[in-house]
C-alpha cells in the first residue's frame, strides 16, 4: 500500500476493520488528548510530544511501535484531525511496516480552510468511545 490515498480510510471503515478484520487502532495524539476520549480499544503511542516550542516529533515513536507490533501487523493510526496520523503512517511505512492504514478526519473531524467541519471524526460519527489513560503506555 504505497499510494497515500489508498491507505486513508473513514472512521466507519476503521471501526469495521477493527471489528471484522482484527486491525489494532493506535491513537497517536498526546497522552492527555487520549485520556480525554479515544476509540474503544485503542492503544496510545504519541507521534508528537510536548517540547520547548510546543509539540515536537517523538524521537522514540517508531521504536515503541516496533516493540509493540510486528512489521506485518494490521494497524490503523488516528489523531485529532488527520495531520499527525499521516505523519505516523509515513514514519511507519518508512520503517518497514506493511499494513498501516491512516484514519482520515481523526477523533474530532476534518476542517476546511474556514474552520468548517468537512468530515466528522470518530467521536462525531457515533462510534464506540472510552476515556482514560492507556494501561499499556510506557
Regions found by a protein language model. Name each.
Residues 77-78:
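Short, surface-exposed ligand- or partner-binding patches at beta-edge/loop junctions that are enriched
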